[in-house]
């Protein structure tokens, strides 16, 4: 059986490969040796679906359909990263993979990136361990692998990541639609624009206010 290491980006995967002595052509979306397989995400491979994925009628913006608060959230593979997702999903479910080492960035967002892929790939029956490192030096990578804890110990971090993403989604979808429907005509006339969307976001709006 082989170990599978999944990094957040190709550059980090290459560093893991160098440390573990895994050679090969990265153009295939992964690297492989007799004992290990190393692959990577390219940042986010999965995104939250827009409202029209729940109901086609929600594609049209209307004050009567907000707030939009789904009881269960839908996710989909990003079109630009579908090829890499299929590669990663296939590796995660390979019969000869015994243990998955999650080596996405050590933090909430890195946790979220892997958990979404894991969920969409329907990975079951595999041992999963979390590599938590502070740098990509050889010593730190080896320590992180050696001391990797069961992925389940990071479930609370995963829950926090999902909730943060859902908060951002609800705020962006609902407030952007509400403010655009109410005030876009005024902004269009003032700026001499043909069309205007007033985008609202948890971070974006705060930064704009500071500027």
Where are the predicted features?
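Intrinsically disordered, low-complexity regulatory segments
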Residues: 1-177, 206-209
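Prokaryote-biased recognition of long, low-complexity C-terminal linker/tail segments
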Residues: 168-211
């Amino acid at each position: 059986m082989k170990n599978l290491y999944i990094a957040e980006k190709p550059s980090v995967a290459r560093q893991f490969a160098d440390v573990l002595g895994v050679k090969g052509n990265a153009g295939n979306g992964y690297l492989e040796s007799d004992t290990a397989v190393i692959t990577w995400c390219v940042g986010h491979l999965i995104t939250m679906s827009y409202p029209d994925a729940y109901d086609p009628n929600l594609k049209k913006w209307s004050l009567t359909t907000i707030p939009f608060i789904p009881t269960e959230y839908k996710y989909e593979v990003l079109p630009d990263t579908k090829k890499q997702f299929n590669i990663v999903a296939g590796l995660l479910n390979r019969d000869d993979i015994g243990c998955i080492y999650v080596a996405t960035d050590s933090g909430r967002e890195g946790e979220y990136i892997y958990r979404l892929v894991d969920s969409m790939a329907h990975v079951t029956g595999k041992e999963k361990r979390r590599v938590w490192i502070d740098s990509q030096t050889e010593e730190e990578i080896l320590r992180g692998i050696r001391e990797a804890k069961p992925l389940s110990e990071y479930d609370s971090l995963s829950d926090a990541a999902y909730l943060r993403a859902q908060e951002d989604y609800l705020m962006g979808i609902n407030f952007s639609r509400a403010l655009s429907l109410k005030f876009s005509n005024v902004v269009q006339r003032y700026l001499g624009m043909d069309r205007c969307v007033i985008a609202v976001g948890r971070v974006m709006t705060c930064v704009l206010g500071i500027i």
